[in-house]
Amino acid sequence: MLSNPAPRTRALIDNIQLFQEYHMKYPSHGYRWLNAKIRLDRGIVMSDPYAHKCCKKAGIKSKAKHYKYKKPGAPFKIFPNLLMSEMQIDRPLQCIVSDMTAFWVKGIYYELTLYMDLWNNEILSHSLSSKRGDRMTYISGLEGLLEKKKQHPEYQMILHSDQGSVYASKAFNDLLPMYVTRSMSRAGTPTDNSAMESINGWIKAELFMDFHVTGERPVQEEVDEYIRFFNEERPAYSLSYLTPKQYREKYAA
């Protein structure tokens, strides 16, 4: 390495070290996301090609693996897929997507149910259980969602899910007020809820690779902390690398 490098070379070296620092903290992400996170945290603006150059020189690659979880469902009531209608989502609480994802920590099985606003990818409600097949994660998460919905009583809302047995059950759907319209993915077609499927994969990668969930602390606390990070500090490609909170504050009426 040069003992007295030119300013541009010195800047490149410094930025390579900066990307290495962020990669150590967030190993599940690639250069575009790391660049956006650096911009968000440090106010340092770099082009994506330049960020790619820094990461390539540092040997940085995303270590994330995509997880897939397919659960059987015995549907009781099937609703049409309203997401297939190519509707325009242009406000908060217009369309909420929900799904359950599962993972293991220190030999204990956990199920996490999420309710996400498709407008800005904000997780509005979540519920965690270490009991396999616990229907209350769905119910508790739904109750949290409906509490937030009370802040905007004027809005109609679509709730989209797969055809899992809880989502299709009479007990679940009887909890829904009149202003909530149900929508469901077609059977065996996870791409109908691709946004939620993608988020589930990233969440599990980030929980273990970036947040290092080990069970040394209560898993509920670690999940709550991650959800806050997801909503407030994690830039999203689909939001032009704003966080869900930033997007809501910038565009919500």
Predicted regions: what they are:
Residues 1-91, 189, 243-251:
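Basic, flexible linker segments flanking DNA-binding modules
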Residues 72-74, 161-163, 169-170, 184-204, ...:
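RNase H-like two-metal-ion nuclease catalytic core shared by retroviral integrases
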Residues 85, 89-124, 128-132:
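An active-site-proximal beta-strand-loop segment
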Residues 122-126, 182-185, 208-210:
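Short small-residue beta-strand/loop micro-motif enriched in glycine and branched aliphatics
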Residues 127-152:
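Active-site beta-loop-alpha junctions of metal-dependent nucleic acid enzymes
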Residues 150-168:
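Cysteine/selenocysteine-centered motifs that mediate thiol-based redox chemistry or coordinate metal-sulfur cofactors
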Residues 173, 177, 202-253:
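C-terminal domain-tail junction helix/linker
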